[in-house]
Design a protein with these regions (language model features):
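Hydrophobic alpha-helical membrane-insertion segments, chiefly the h-region
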Residues: 14-25
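Active-site-adjacent loops and short helices of periplasmic peptidoglycan-processing enzymes
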Residues: 26-175
Length: 175
């Protein structure tokens, strides 16, 4: 009985594999680059992390507003700065006045409250908190302008030649 089941499963597997092979051959798929990817985003880029080879791009050089992807750079600069100064993410910081009431998505920070850098990072990345971005910029950079300069410098170091940040949260800015 077990032998019969094994033969049946093997036969089905072979038939499926052959069917896929015929389908691929019939439709002319010879390699992964010939497959059209349906991406609804305006821009896209897929890169091999090991080699740096660009595997797919869609309007990669077209100017676009960074929106909340800005928050990724805010998190990166924050994490690298904390590591550089050997500061624990659990370190408590005081929320600056300018972080209270920032428009858009928020973690509802109150000026003067104490919160850990780690919690600000969670609020930044999980809730997309614009107020958390402003608080981190003020705390890490001394002010938002200097922090944005740090972000742009880091982007340049990473090879982002056409990238320009105007604020730490990605809210609309003509720049």
């Amino acid at each position: 009985m077990k032998k019969g089941k094994l033969i049946f499963i093997t036969a089905v597997a072979v038939a499926v594999c052959m069917g896929i092979g015929f389908y691929v051959q019939k439709h002319g798929f010879t390699d992964a680059t010939s497959v059209e990817i349906g991406i609804s985003a305006g821009q896209a880029l897929l890169m091999d992390a090991d080699t740096g080879e660009v595997l797919y791009e869609k309007c990669a050089d077209q100017k676009a507003y960074p929106a909340s992807t800005t928050k990724i750079m805010t998190a990166l600069v924050t994490l690298e700065t904390m590591e550089e100064y050997d500061s624990p993410l659990e370190q408590k910081v005081r929320v600056p006045e300018v972080a209270e009431g920032v428009e858009g998505s928020s973690i509802y920070l109150k000026a003067g409250e104490e919160i850990s850098v780690q919690d600000l990072l969670y609020g930044l990345m999980l809730v997309s908190g614009n107020d958390a971005a402003v608080a981190l910029a003020e705390i890490i950079g001394g002010d938002q302008e200097h922090f944005v300069e740090m972000m742009n410098n880091r982007a340049a170091e990473l090879g982002c030649s056409s990238t320009h940040f105007a604020n730490p949260n990605g809210l609309f800015d003509e720049d």
